[in-house]
Amino acid sequence: MKQPVPSAHFDGFPREFTDFLFSLRFRNTIDLLPENKIKYKALITEPLTLLSNDLTQTALSISDTLNVKPSKCVSTMYSDMRFSRATPLKEYMYIRFREPSCEHDILGLYFDMGCEGYSYGIRIYNQTSAGMESIREGVLAKRRDFTRELEKLSSHGIMIVGDKYARDHYPDITDNNSIKVLLNMRSFHMCWDKAIDETVFNRALLDEITCAYRGLNNIFLLLKQALLQN
């Protein structure tokens, strides 16, 4: 009796991927595209798709409306030829679990990686000033909830990164730095940034991102609720 073939799971990126991505800085040409495509598929596209598949249930446990189709979530190997005609392949990779399509302020979980480092967390795609104002209103309306989650995440090393106002727009808030930082952002994302290390070459990367996504559950839902008012 023929045994069923077990489904594949993510077990790390091949060690060669860093050297390959670095080499694309110098060898990413149309002439070398046939050779590079074969390597790209094996070293990046295939393991990245497995990683996305293995993160899917965690993403859906945070928000069951996230788009988790690999064709929508996993970066393709090809650069946008409108802007990168001479360099046909991407020199980085990403996974995007985003809320259903709309024109702006699209909340999502992400993972990015290049040859030197990787990052994961929460992004808001096509962020607008109106969307940011909705978030500020949500923060102020649920100040205690946001404070609890931001302080918890800060203790675990998350960063709020983005474009800040030149001056403090909330000088009256003197007892809550985590809230003040978020309120004074024009745009932002929440992330953990890591250097490439042994983690990316085995299943530990999946475990690390899974744990981080679960820790983002409450802040993700708070941001989602705030943006629904936009």
Where are the predicted features?
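Surface-exposed helix-capping loop/turn segments at secondary-structure junctions
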Residues: 55-66, 154, 222-230
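Short histidine-centered catalytic/ligand-binding loop motif
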Residues: 37-44, 124, 134-139, 201, ...
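Compact, glycine/acidic-enriched structural inserts
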Residues: 114-174
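Soluble extramembrane domains of integral membrane proteins
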Residues: 70-73, 79-82, 86-96, 106, ...
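Glycine-rich, often proline-containing surface loops adjacent to acidic residues and nearby aromatics
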Residues: 35, 115-120, 184-192
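Long, solvent-exposed, polar/charged low-complexity segments
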Residues: 1-30, 49-52, 140, 161-230
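Aromatic- and glycine-enriched beta-alpha-beta binding-site module
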Residues: 80-141
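Active-site acidic/histidine clusters and adjacent loop/turn architecture
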Residues: 22-74
